[in-house]
């Protein structure tokens, strides 16, 4: 499918990157970026609709909430049209009622994690903290989220390498929480206003780092689910549409977990060479300690 799309629309930026293997195509987008032209995604819809009656119809994985993988009524369709942008939004709207082999792979609601709207609200609250009292409710939300990660530990144990990443993330998160509580304790013993303001900034920075770690581990749950599906269906033609950050992490893990060849392309069909083996952002500093060997 990728070759046909690039040939038809070589200069239309509908997606950011694509990962290809023999029977896997993974498309990465910038979430909620308004499409200037839906031609690429229209082509994808046409391609899949031609395949929907085939015995070997491709499986379509969309980064859409697993608990919201269908429309209950016409009002839901109308509301969905009004809210959201991007290729995944377009594909879900056009295919969910007609294409039989769709799986929604964003399990974050199902696992009890924060919604994207809740994450943005929490991030904004942290950014606008002006007193130490405002730190506590934000910390409590992140502490509860950390407990939820622990409750869901079995979810991450399906593949050893993926589980090791989960454990290192949890370890670093716990260290961050311990450090944050220590900083709050130090703040309580400060007497001068100037020193308190300086320490409050340090507390905010530590709280924000904890937020990023929680957000990244929540996002990682999507990677785990997609990778599990790909590994358990080695002979099935599968198209994946997800955020670009998911694409890079999935690409990284598939290369070290399988002996299959995967190539990374940009939206112009040019091969992209990855010079770093770092699958996570700067906030996950323990990645080097993980033994990725099988």
Outline where the language-model segments fall.
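Compositional signal for N-terminal targeting/processing segments
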Residues: 1-294
């Amino acid at each position: 499918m990728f070759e046909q799309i690039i040939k038809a629309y070589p200069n239309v930026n509908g997606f950011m990157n694509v990962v290809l293997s023999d029977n896997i195509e993974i498309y990465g987008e910038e979430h909620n970026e308004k499409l200037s032209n839906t031609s690429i995604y229209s082509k994808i819809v046409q391609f899949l609709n031609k395949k929907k009656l085939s015995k070997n119809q491709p499986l379509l994985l969309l980064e859409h909430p697993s608990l919201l993988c269908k429309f209950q009524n016409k009002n839901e369709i109308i509301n969905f049209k009004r809210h959201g942008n991007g290729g995944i939004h377009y594909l879900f709207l056009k295919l969910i009622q007609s294409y039989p082999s769709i799986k929604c792979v964003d399990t974050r609601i199902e696992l009890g994690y924060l919604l994207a709207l809740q994450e943005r609200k929490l991030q904004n609250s942290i950014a606008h903290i002006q007193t130490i009292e405002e730190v506590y409710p934000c910390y409590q939300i992140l502490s509860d989220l950390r407990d939820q990660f622990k409750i869901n530990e079995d979810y991450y144990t399906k593949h050893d390498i993926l589980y090791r990443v989960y454990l290192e993330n949890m370890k670093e998160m716990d260290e961050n929480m311990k450090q944050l509580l220590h900083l709050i304790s130090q703040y309580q013993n400060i007497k001068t206003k100037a020193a308190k303001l300086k320490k409050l900034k340090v507390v905010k920075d530590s709280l924000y780092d904890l937020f990023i770690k929680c957000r990244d581990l929540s996002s990682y749950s999507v990677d785990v689910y997609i990778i599990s599906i790909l590994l358990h269906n080695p002979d099935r033609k599968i198209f994946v549409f997800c955020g670009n950050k998911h694409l890079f992490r999935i690409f990284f893990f598939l290369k070290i977990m399988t002996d299959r060849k995967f190539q990374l392309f940009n939206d112009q069909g040019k091969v992209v060479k990855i010079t770093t083996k770092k699958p996570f952002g700067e906030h996950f500093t323990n990645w080097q300690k993980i033994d990725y060997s099988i």
